[in-house]
C-alpha cells in the first residue's frame, strides 16, 4: 500500500514545518486513510 507511506512522508514534512497545521493535516489524513480502508 503506497498511499499510507506517502501520507506519512507528507505528515512528517508538515510536522517540521508547522505543528498546528500538522495536527489538522494529520486529522484529515487519518479520515482519508479510514475511508480508503473501508472502501
Curated annotation (Swiss-Prot):
Source organism, top-level taxon: Eukaryota
Protein name: Uncharacterized protein YKL106C-A
Protein's organism: Saccharomyces cerevisiae (strain ATCC 204508 / S288c) (Baker's yeast)
Amino acid at each position: 500500500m503506497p498511499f499510507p507511506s506517502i501520507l506519512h512522508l507528507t505528515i512528517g514534512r508538515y510536522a517540521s514545518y508547522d505543528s498546528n497545521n500538522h495536527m489538522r493535516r494529520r486529522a484529515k489524513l487519518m479520515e482519508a486513510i479510514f475511508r480508503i480502508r473501508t472502501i
